Amino acid sequence: MSRTIAAALAVAALAVGTATAAPAASGLSPTFTTCRDKAQGAVEQAACLTSESARQDQRLNQAYRQLQAKLSGAKKTKLVNAQRAWLQSRSRDGELDTALYDDSQPGNLQGELNDVMRLSARADQLQKYLQLLD
């Protein structure tokens, strides 16, 4: 019984965390927000996160390629080095998420949400750099 209560509390905490965490990255898609709001259960939430992760990864890669095309020499090298460092940081943050959150569905969902937020924040940052160059 206490495991059931703990699981219910974890799902409730995730729902609150998701609702408050999502606006932090401005590039999250309206599709994700709608999907998340309509999701009923962990499987549907996971599907929303998987789709949004793919969207954010595509957005990040597009911004990165556009920046690479606009930069040359030392600036381009700095971009490549910064992106490599970000990828390492993202990986380490994911490892920390895995260590901190349990292996339950809510823990896994929170880890995935955190990664989506990291992707979105990095894509936002790269798009701001593009705006500086325009």
Regions found by a protein language model. Give the residues of each.
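N-terminal alpha-helical modules
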Residues: 2-4, 20-134
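Bacterial N-terminal signal peptides
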Residues: 7-17
